[in-house]
């Protein structure tokens, strides 16, 4: 009996052994692993994954591999190797893994965030870039849209003067409406049931992504009931139902002479493809309603929670450092004053503010670990071979917290992005990729940077954001999902006296 069991275990171990394509090649050093379960028993059970993987670099080096179940994953934690993956060999590593959770979220590899490399992903990414180009100039200029929503946000917060509030909901409304103007050329009013629906499904998706879904590591388990997958399906169905209603209205009212939103542009591309007006490269199957909904869903998923979260991180760090907040406000007062509101042209003058935003993106990156990439061909990273189909994860936390690249990396020091005189922004290290890079870089980076600057500048010009009367400071620990979220906290809103006096003068 024992002999038979031993034989079966050996047979399983042999069957699931790593298949090395090039026996003579040098592969990254690997964590220990067992048949079927891979390296899971050898991974730390407590703490944030990005921190744990960073700590493993002390033993295994800046590039190492592990097995998630039977699948090999390479972890990259040095900027030179990361840039090789993302830029130099960006096309070779531009694939995406196919796992159950993300397949549901992307409606089976549709959209621009989680779709594998191929014609659909290339086409939709190209169209999204074209859509952002609609907002370069004129009345639809991106800056005007952001300033409009920021103004409404400030007006809303002014009604809360002297009160202690959670910024999450008002920020979510403002950031969501920026995305709505881009995608639909419309916006939501405070209290709209659709907005609450959107906020709830966003929260549900992030909660699902936060959990370690065993089915993503062991796909065979898909045949069994799974609460996480069911929750993801439920949230995605709600999202698609909401977006489908908007989509249908846009199709009914579509006017090819008035392309004012991303959805208009996608509908136009579909009509052109259906009419064979754009050549053989645009197959109408790639522009099905499901493909379009997935792309719009990705823009919302990537554009709303990310910016909302980073603004809250900025406020949290300023609450911990009131002297820095005061210096930024003095900078705004001197360079902008109160007779007008901040614009993007002020970025060259509000250097401490810009440095603070950059430092927040360093110390609390939007995604501590980038969405996994996949090797499309047999390739290499540095001196190490990487086989076709291998998953590759860039540990952004490791890049941004490398002691050899950053002085006291765990300290919040915006001044590191300024020269000694404080009169010029600098790049203190090449180990800084807050929005990724290469073919899979964040497609909304320009939008995000503009939002972060304008939201923060307007808020600090108009308000004193203060610690509540109970003295409760926000936790800076956070918890990573697809986005590095900050735990909810409250802030006391006070309209600045100087702003109030300036407005009173202007009205007389």
Curated annotation (Swiss-Prot):
One Pfam family named in its UniProt record: p450
Binding site for heme: 442
SUPFAM superfamilies noted in UniProt: Cytochrome P450
Catalytic activity: a C21-steroid + reduced [NADPH--hemoprotein reductase] + O2 = a 17alpha-hydroxy-C21-steroid + oxidized [NADPH--hemoprotein reductase] + H2O + H(+); progesterone + reduced [NADPH--hemoprotein reductase] + O2 = 17alpha-hydroxyprogesterone + oxidized [NADPH--hemoprotein reductase] + H2O + H(+); pregnenolone + reduced [NADPH--hemoprotein reductase] + O2 = 17alpha-hydroxypregnenolone + oxidized [NADPH--hemoprotein reductase] + H2O + H(+); 17alpha-hydroxyprogesterone + reduced [NADPH--hemoprotein reductase] + O2 = androst-4-ene-3,17-dione + acetate + oxidized [NADPH--hemoprotein reductase] + H2O + 2 H(+)
Pathway(s) the chain acts in: Steroid hormone biosynthesis; Steroid biosynthesis; glucocorticoid biosynthesis
Major location (coarse): endoplasmic reticulum
Its job: A cytochrome P450 monooxygenase involved in corticoid and androgen biosynthesis. Catalyzes 17-alpha hydroxylation of C21 steroids, which is common for both pathways. A second oxidative step, required only for androgen synthesis, involves an acyl-carbon cleavage. The 17-alpha hydroxy intermediates, as part of adrenal glucocorticoids biosynthesis pathway, are precursors of cortisol.
UniProt record similarity statement: Belongs to the cytochrome P450 family.
Stated name of the protein: Steroid 17-alpha-hydroxylase/17,20 lyase
Protein source organism: Equus caballus (Horse)
